[in-house]
């Protein structure tokens, strides 16, 4: 049975940042999907790709700023200066701000690729259970593989973490660190997205709208050529429709976008993020 000092579960930004601080001999990182990035996700649609997870990120820490500066210099990240809007009385309006925003280049998962350049990741490896093994921990994968570790860092959403840690008293974490869902729908868009005053917009926060949480025009981001629109639904709407078929979600959101912006769209796909973000943002 293989052994490592530190086992890291999840190759999203948190897992990659932790791995970057460790000697390569001291850790193994397990990622259930085919590549790094976590919710910095993009998906191929026809001949192009669209960001279906986080639409941008901001910087609030000088250490992270240094990382972002390096990623920009290497071509993996670029600033994004969209014409911002929001919803007021359920209507789209311009709402410019001075917030510095960044996106992966050419897609959001490029930041994950940058952070993982010198990190070996065991992809398509889902950890099913973590159990005590003397003064160590034993990790059991769905593939049947197992290994031991002196320390385990779990970066998965809390509900998935609790399921892995059935041998430990962590059940209370499920309610303390609850996560909200988000339905994401990608639509075709062959004309500008405009606010109620006729001004073209690149992205909108949901404001007081009951369905829309965030909307982004893909080709407003540097490096994107696709005529696609990405819509995140609100946590409340997503929870209400959580178990519905993705085709039904696509049609509901397509109708809402078409009615709100008076544009003709075609639904391309919908993706359910069951654990999109913390219910209580004080833990972010």
Question: Language-model segments: what does each one mean?
Answer:
Residues 42-85:
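N-terminal FAD cofactor-binding segment of flavoenzymes
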Residues 3-29:
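N-terminal Rossmann-like FAD-binding beta1-loop-alpha1 element of flavoenzymes
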Residues 123-138:
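A conserved short coil-to-beta-strand element within the FAD-binding core of flavoproteins
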Residues 37, 146-200, 263:
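Central helical "cap/lid" subdomain
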Residues 56-62, 92-114, 243-252:
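Short beta-strand to alpha-helix junction loop
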Residues 20-45:
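Glycine-rich FAD pyrophosphate-binding loop
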Residues 186-242, 248-261:
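Active-site substrate-recognition segment that forms the wall
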Residues 251, 258-284:
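Flavin (FAD/FMN) cofactor-binding core of flavoprotein oxidoreductases
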